[in-house]
Amino acid sequence: MVFHRFEDYDKHYLTPDLSTGLAPVIEGTYMYYCLINKEAGTGSELHYHPNELLIFPIKGKINALVGKERRIVEPGMFVHVPAYARHSMKATEDGDLQYLYIKDQTWTVVGLAEDEAVPDKAMSVDEINKVHDSGVGRTRAEGKSEVIIEGLNNSFYPILNSLDDAPVSGRRTIRVEGERLAFTFTEVPPGDRDEIVNNPHEEFTYMLTGRMSANVDGETKEIGPGDIVEVPRGGARSLVAGNEAPVRHVTISSMPFLENVIDNKKD
């Protein structure tokens, strides 16, 4: 299936002992693609994980910490959390929160406490929820934490003032590349056509505003806000913008480093 909507998937607590985050999870080949939901005033404890994390809020405000830097993040700002970086994401008291949450598949979506060592094997969502519901709690691995707090530089990237910004006059793209995943914001004029015959990376595109005609390997759909388009490596896809402006979407792509790591695990 190449077309998705988050409401078609069951929600799960991803790390219930450390976070109130409830999310549907779409599992690709190289990444986990999720929509985190948090009630006003709730969020996560300080934690980390061995995989890279990309965040883009679509509703509400995040009281966000990455490393030592704290920001109030609203829709229109992208947050990059490098692998092993200490972080915390909490919904402000203003209202409930939703944000796109994408992790690479070198680890699961389950996080680790700030002072916890990295275990030999990551827990699955089902495993951490069973342990949490039992009241016993997880068994921590022996050793020192590998959390990174210092030297992370600026992880916050302004993309839009708000999701309601007026349309721009031309085609605009803003791209941020991490080690394993890349984030691309795109705004296109009506009628814009974007085609790739042999897609070099896995991609998930989330529609923010406007409408487009999408075709992935012969499967077609008219897409609008909240629709997700999954394109596998080597796939063919086209996106044609409709007449309703602005047409905006965000795309997460796998990077060569990640592809090499995951592909070598399969061998």
Model region roles, listed by residue range:
Residues 16-19, 34-48, 165-171, 184-199:
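Conserved short histidine dyad/triad with adjacent acidic residue
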Residues 68-83, 218-234:
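Short acidic-glycine-tyrosine-enriched beta hairpin
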Residues 75-77, 83-110, 233-259:
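Ligand-binding loop in jelly-roll beta-barrel domains
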Residues 1-30, 114-180, 264-267:
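A short, N-terminal "cap"/entry segment at the start of jelly-roll beta-barrel domains
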